[in-house]
Amino acid sequence: MTELSITGQQVMPPPACTPPEPFRITTNAPHQMNDASLTPGRRKLQKWLGRVLRIVITDGRVLVGFFNCTDRDANIVLSMCAEYLVEGQEPRLLGNVMVPGQHIVSLSIDEPDPQSSLLVQ
């Protein structure tokens, strides 16, 4: 099916919108790594990837965003991060943020585990 543009030329309609793909985890780790070769701590971190974390830092600010990665110094990278200065105030949207491990006071998962919920039909 074609449509006419303002100039009278025939144009194809845009393709149907498709829902976004689910969160995809990428890694540069060797492919032979499997779940059995991971330490319990690394296994837990892997489960947290893509989840929403709430991090309180030393100056009292609260950062909430999607957990992307960490390193050996406990630095954490969050995407789509929001900063909360005072409870009840509007958050400030920051985007991608690297939180130094030395400034992290507490860290928590801010959403329920999607795999732990049961769907009833």
Curated annotation (Swiss-Prot):
GO annotation, cellular component aspect: NatC complex; nucleus
SUPFAM superfamilies documented for this protein: Sm-like ribonucleoproteins (SSF50182)
Keyword Cytoplasm: yes
MF terms (GO), sorted A to Z: RNA binding
The keyword Cytoplasm appears for this protein: yes
Disulfide bond sites: none
Key words, A-Z: Cytoplasm, Nucleus
Additional observations: When it was originally identified as the potential ortholog of GEMIN7 this protein was named 'Sabbat' after the 7th day of the week.
Function description: Auxiliary component of the N-terminal acetyltransferase C (NatC) complex which catalyzes acetylation of N-terminal methionine residues. May have an accessory function in the survival motor neuron (SMN) complex.
Assembly notes: Component of the N-terminal acetyltransferase C (NatC) complex, which is composed of Naa35, Sbat/Naa38 and Naa30A. Interacts with Smn and Hez; along with Hez and Vlet, may form an accessory subcomplex involved in SMN complex function.
Record protein name field: N-alpha-acetyltransferase 38, NatC auxiliary subunit
Organism (species): Drosophila melanogaster
Organism taxonomic ancestry: Eukaryota, Metazoa, Ecdysozoa, Arthropoda, Hexapoda
